[in-house]
Curated annotation (Swiss-Prot):
It is a peripheral membrane protein. GO terms for molecular function: ATP binding; proton-transporting ATP synthase activity, rotational mechanism. The lineage of its organism: Eukaryota, Viridiplantae, Streptophyta, Embryophyta, Tracheophyta. Disulfide bonds: none annotated. It is found in: Plastid, Chloroplast thylakoid membrane. This is ATP synthase epsilon chain, chloroplastic. One of its GO terms (cellular component) is chloroplast thylakoid membrane. It comes from Jasminum nudiflorum.
Amino acid sequence: MTFNLCVLTPNRIIWDSEVKEIILSTNSGQIGVLPNHAPIATAVDIGILRIRFNDQWLTVALMGGFARIGNNEITVLVNDAERGSDIDPQEAQQTLEIAEANLRKAEGKRQRIEANLALRRARTRLEAVNVIS
């Protein structure tokens, strides 16, 4: 049994297809979703979306947003997203190193908050690459 998953950013459709299962990072932790899941709306955290599609797991790095689950359909609206298979591992590692350096040299509260968010995004992108099997 499957359900429809649609992952959207303001600029493009990342995913729109039938899937068997997902694991979604929300602001209150990860949730697993199978067909006939109870209807909910939830905030999506910066994190990994794991998608079970044709008996293999795929990853998408999500950069925060909202999800609506109901009637065997999930719509995920996020600020930005990248499929794990589209991310260059070397570039993701370099971005992580730059984000770590920026956090170390951040001076004001605002700079620390922005550097921390950049670090979370960089870690998420690298994790999306590294969990590809």
